Amino acid sequence: MAKKVQAYVKLQVAAGMANPSPPVGPALGQQGVNIMEFCKAFNAKTDSMEKGLPIPVVITVYADRSFTFVTKTPPAAVLLKKAAGIKSGSGKPNKDKVGTITRAQLQEIAQTKAADMTGADIEAMTRSIEGTARSMGLVVED
């Protein structure tokens, strides 16, 4: 018989930099999970990724206080900021443009995100990422 699920905990943790301080410690401590065990496992799984990149993670906590976790791809906004070389998006995206990004870069980001996105094809995913870019104040060039 399968283990009984106690809770699902969704967090964004920097790749390779999980530690017991907030947000990890309080979220997992509440559920009675061994925090250091999670930190070691997460850091081992994300050591091949760029350090400091925020990685969404879904932690499944079981009734016996054991856990499993699934890492997702970084948020599209983070990948767009990195590709455009900007620190943050525009406060007024329709008026103030903060940078430019090419369609090739958008397709590259869409392929990175393909595992997590439910789009029908790569073109649909690219258009979705393009919408995110525009809402951040980025100009899309062909």
Swiss-Prot record:
<keyword id="KW-0689">Ribosomal protein</keyword>
<keyword id="KW-0694">RNA-binding</keyword>
<dbReference type="InterPro" id="IPR020784">
    <property type="entry name" value="Ribosomal_uL11_N"/>
</dbReference>
<keyword id="KW-0687">Ribonucleoprotein</keyword>
<comment type="function">
    <text>Forms part of the ribosomal stalk which helps the ribosome interact with GTP-bound translation factors.</text>
</comment>
<dbReference type="Pfam" id="PF03946">
    <property type="entry name" value="Ribosomal_L11_N"/>
</dbReference>
<dbReference type="InterPro" id="IPR036769">
    <property type="entry name" value="Ribosomal_uL11_C_sf"/>
</dbReference>
<dbReference type="InterPro" id="IPR006519">
    <property type="entry name" value="Ribosomal_uL11_bac-typ"/>
</dbReference>
<dbReference type="InterPro" id="IPR000911">
    <property type="entry name" value="Ribosomal_uL11"/>
</dbReference>
<dbReference type="InterPro" id="IPR036796">
    <property type="entry name" value="Ribosomal_uL11_N_sf"/>
</dbReference>
<keyword id="KW-0699">rRNA-binding</keyword>
<dbReference type="GO" id="GO:0006412">
    <property type="term" value="P:translation"/>
</dbReference>
<keyword id="KW-0488">Methylation</keyword>
<dbReference type="InterPro" id="IPR020783">
    <property type="entry name" value="Ribosomal_uL11_C"/>
</dbReference>
<comment type="similarity">
    <text>Belongs to the universal ribosomal protein uL11 family.</text>
</comment>
<protein>
    <recommendedName>
        <fullName>Large ribosomal subunit protein uL11</fullName>
    </recommendedName>
</protein>
<dbReference type="GO" id="GO:0003735">
    <property type="term" value="F:structural constituent of ribosome"/>
</dbReference>
<comment type="subunit">
    <text>Part of the ribosomal stalk of the 50S ribosomal subunit. Interacts with L10 and the large rRNA to form the base of the stalk. L10 forms an elongated spine to which L12 dimers bind in a sequential fashion forming a multimeric L10(L12)X complex.</text>
</comment>
<dbReference type="GO" id="GO:0070180">
    <property type="term" value="F:large ribosomal subunit rRNA binding"/>
</dbReference>
<dbReference type="Pfam" id="PF00298">
    <property type="entry name" value="Ribosomal_L11"/>
</dbReference>
<dbReference type="GO" id="GO:0022625">
    <property type="term" value="C:cytosolic large ribosomal subunit"/>
</dbReference>
<dbReference type="InterPro" id="IPR020785">
    <property type="entry name" value="Ribosomal_uL11_CS"/>
</dbReference>
